[in-house]
Amino acid sequence: MYTEDGFELRPLGDTMEIYASGEIFHEPEPPVIRSIHRMQSHFPTGKLLCDVRLAAYILEPDEREERATQIADMLKDFTCAVICMTEQRNFIDHVVEKVVASQGKIRIFPSKAEARDWLESQPGTLPASRAHRPA
């Protein structure tokens, strides 16, 4: 498990679980994205479970667009299940649209159990960016 202010990463089976919490403000490169990339060298996986129910996105419209793009760029290489609250759906739906437009595989769920069930039914492939590492 890896914890930093605002998020926690937990490897579980063949899935990396990400728990975001607190107020999410504009940052040029969110620490969670850097941490997920770093964790791939220790726990290579193609599956992410992202629980954002405890996160509050405090962003201006242009910042929301930039954050959605940053998140989508990272998630597009994974099979991803997102758990969110109804009031977060607007932003999360926008992220999902961007991931799908990039040929990524992502779904939104209201509960962790449903998200885990779906992820377990998905093939456990590594992200394309990690699958062909030179020896």
Language-model region placement:
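Amphipathic, Lys/Arg-enriched alpha-helical "gate/interface" segment within cytosolic domains
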Residues: M1-A135
